[in-house]
Amino acid sequence: MKAGWREAAFNNGWTYRDWVPRAAAGTLVSEWLADRYRHSDAGLWQQRIAAGELDWNEALLTGDRALQGGETLCWRRPPWLEQTIPDQWETIHDDGDLLVINKPSGLPVMPGGGFLHHTLMALLEPTGARPVHRLGRFTSGLQVCARTPQTRALWSKQFRPDGGCRKVYQAWSQRVPGLELGQCLTVSSDVVERPHPLLGWIWGPEPFDGAPIRKRLSAHSELELLERRAEGDRLQVTITTGRPHQIRIHLAQLGSPLLGDPLYLMNREISATATPGDGGYRLHAWRLDGGEFALQSSFPTDWGIL
């Protein structure tokens, strides 16, 4: 294992709790869980029940049965192997409360997507700092954290659309049609929640095929073309809204997804086998401009296109 990386390791497992709505009465436990957690089908949930991993109202569930509605289900997930992660970073600012780091690509900020302890949140626990927002696992750059609830609340407010904080990223994308060097382009299309076979629902661009949309969020991005190569475009992207995967989605909406993005594809399609935590793209949180408070981070060593 090279320096600056934490080896893959087993955690101690985790207990997931779900309250069952009354409307689910009569549905088998395995079927309800399979619908809620699309990564596992009913047969796999039946295996977990047989293995003694599920509780019904705090008592062991000994067999698949019909739900009554209103009960609590607990899945005691056994320990699993968490992947290796980078665990070193550059500190950009630290005044004893506010902490801003240059997060390396590949480090998850919070639990999710197969990570529980191999996260920035867990690594920061001894310092008392906690993340204010969440960069994607494979997005590098400025990650704001704070040690007190007051400072976390202050910065969370600044990150809102009317908070006055400008977040400036750089990204490598497929060529953006009609955009020339130095030109800017405004993207104000909604980020929408649409079906996904593994996750149930996922945030993405508005589909061409009329697929159902569960929710919409307004989003605003400003693009500027900094460099054009045969392989793709290097863009500066400024956002005032912080929607889930906003930059990845807006570029896919334009038909110019991030180079190497395994999830958001051409023609506004979304991969049926990838998830938001999969890497391969290049997106860097470069600058934060909060008026009198401005910070900038250096790029990863492999940022350019070879």
Question: Where do the PLM segments sit?
Answer:
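RNA pseudouridine synthases
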Residues: 1-306
